[in-house]
Amino acid sequence: VNDLTPDSGNEVRNADTLEKFFEGTDVEIARYESHPGRVSIVVTVPGDPEKEPLTLMGHTDVVPVDEPKWTKPPFDALIEDGKLYGRGAVDMLFITASMAAVTRKIAQEGNPGGTLAFVGMADEEARGGLGVKFMSEQHPDAFSWKNCLSETGGSHLPGALGFNVGEKGAGQRRLHVHGDAGHGSTPYGKDFAILKIGEVA
């Protein structure tokens, strides 16, 4: 559970599970620890370097729970009436598990075409400082960032298929502009600061 502190998350447990899942397959496995217990895992199925690579990236952390508000045990992965209940079942461990299963299947069958990588990334729920940011800054060549598929997040309507081409985030800036004070009733011919900041923003 990632409570937004560096010592939480403990994604090493999921990295261990994923590494065991790939035992006996012809893959390359690398682990990257950004902070004690905060492990991202990269599983690579080597392919033809002349062909396009593909990276499947899923995160392995989940957010905390307010357990009294849950009607099912949040960490038991309970299957009831064909439905899986648990923290992370929707965001996004079901996608991460599916990506791992597809990668293992392709590794077992061989010949992926281009190189296929599966990444179980730590620290997505806390903006990725110990996950994607760490990997991009400290280990940018651990896998191909080109043709990288990840989550769309949350739940969707049945039959809906969502695609994101980017990720929104906070980018706070302080802008200073200088101009004349004025009144909205006489806007013409004035050097209004609000007009300048509108052009910048």
Residue ranges, per PLM feature:
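Acidic/His- and Gly-rich active-site-bordering loop/insert found
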Residues: V1-R87, I106-G113
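Soluble non-cytosolic domains of exported or imported proteins
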Residues: T5-R13, L93, Y188-D191, L195
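Extracytoplasmic/secreted proteins, especially bacterial periplasmic and envelope-associated proteins
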Residues: R13, T17, F134, K196-E199
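Fold-independent oxyanion-binding glycine-rich loops
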Residues: Y32-H35, G58-T60, D81, M121-A122, ...
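Acidic/histidine-rich catalytic neighborhood of metal-dependent amide-processing enzymes
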Residues: L84, V90-G166
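Acidic-enriched catalytic cores of C-N bond-cleaving enzymes acting on peptides and small amides
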Residues: P140-D141, G154-S155, V165, G184-A201
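The feature captures the short pre-catalytic strand/loop hairpin that immediately precedes
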Residues: Q172-S185
